[in-house]
């Protein structure tokens, strides 16, 4: 068998119906859309409506809730801090504060604070002051000979 000899099984495909092509076609004039109304117009669909079938958002159970006073933190990884210090965008001699991280472009916005995580290689001796940090990030900074000061531990949790 060759590629050009391949074909669909009989009845597997159906010829496309061209609608709105005159009354003799059986799908002319209204084109199967009925008379007037929202559903006869083009590009209109009622979102979430599944033709009377119970919609997906109602079939699934309600779960969880949104915390009303949720804190959103900007996340910074130690590996990126290391790269910015090596590139000269952050001053490794001075304490690295949240304002310094924003000024360097490492973080776009502080949001409710900055949280440091331990992803990446880190071996610089730095003093970092941030709102929150993971335990592994604190260990990594202290192992390198620096210090990581968490200014607001309650907010970071």
Swiss-Prot record:
This is Large ribosomal subunit protein uL15. Keywords: Ribonucleoprotein, Ribosomal protein, RNA-binding, rRNA-binding. GO terms for biological process: translation. InterPro entries: Ribosomal_uL15 (IPR030878), Ribosomal_uL15/eL18 (IPR021131), Ribosomal_uL15/eL18_sf (IPR036227), Ribosomal_uL15_bac-type (IPR005749). Belongs to the universal ribosomal protein uL15 family. Binds to the 23S rRNA. The keyword rRNA-binding applies. GO terms for molecular function: rRNA binding; structural constituent of ribosome. The keyword rRNA-binding applies. GO terms for cellular component: cytosolic large ribosomal subunit. Residues 21-35 have a biased composition (Gly residues). Residues 1-40 are annotated as: Disordered. Part of the 50S ribosomal subunit. SUPFAM superfamilies: Ribosomal proteins L15p and L18e.
């Amino acid at each position: 068998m060759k590629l050009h000899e391949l074909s669909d099984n009989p009845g597997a495909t159906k010829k496309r119906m061209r609608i709105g092509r005159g009354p003799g076609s059986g799908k002319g004039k209204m084109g199967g859309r009925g008379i007037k109304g929202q559903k006869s117009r083009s590009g209109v669909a009622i979102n979430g409506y599944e033709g009377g079938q119970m919609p997906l958002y109602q079939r699934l159970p309600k779960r969880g809730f949104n915390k009303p006073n949720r804190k959103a933190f900007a996340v910074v990884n130690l590996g990126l801090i290391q790269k910015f210090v090596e590139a000269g965008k952050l001053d490794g001699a001075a304490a690295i504060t949240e304002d310094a991280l924003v000024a360097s472009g490492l973080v776009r916005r502080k949001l409710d604070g900055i949280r440091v995580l331990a992803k990446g290689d880190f071996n610089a001796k730095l003093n970092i002051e941030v709102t929150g940090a993971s335990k592994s990030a604190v260990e990594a900074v202290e192992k390198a000979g620096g210090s990581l000061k968490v200014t607001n531990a309650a907010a970071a949790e």
